[in-house]
Amino acid sequence: LVDVAVKSNANCIKFQTHITEKEMIKSNITPGNISKKTLWSIIKNCELSEKEERKLQQYCKLKKITFLSTPFSIEAVDRLKEIKMPAYKIGSGELTNVPFLEHIAKTRKPVILSTGMSELSEIKSAVKLFKKFKIPLAILQTTSIYPANYSDINLGVIEKYYDIFDV
């Protein structure tokens, strides 16, 4: 995947950092029509060990492409901090997790904030938190439907975000 990104002239590649035991309670919940496997087993199967993640980050460095990852727990933030990740990408499902957001803000690293599953009031609260800590911030209009229909993409909200948040 890294090699394909480099070949495509990407300057950054983003992964996800899951430490399943720290981000969810083990249960038999299945994600509807996507899979018959439990959500726990799907996430656990996608999890990279700390050693694997360090190896991936080092490979990105060798290939001169920026390594980023979306953490899903405070422990994942700490792991990424140890490998000196330059910024944090936050998934829209985490915008209401204030202790998590504050933990990221305390790293003093720039933040890329997804908004797909969030209400405007939730986005405003998260932006206010990062501005309080004077964290460089990028706000992404994202659509949390895969694949997304063109009618659901709502690119017009980007201008609204620009006006509201002055970013």
What are these regions (language model features)?
Residues L1-V167:
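Catalytic cores and adjacent flexible loops of soluble metabolic enzymes
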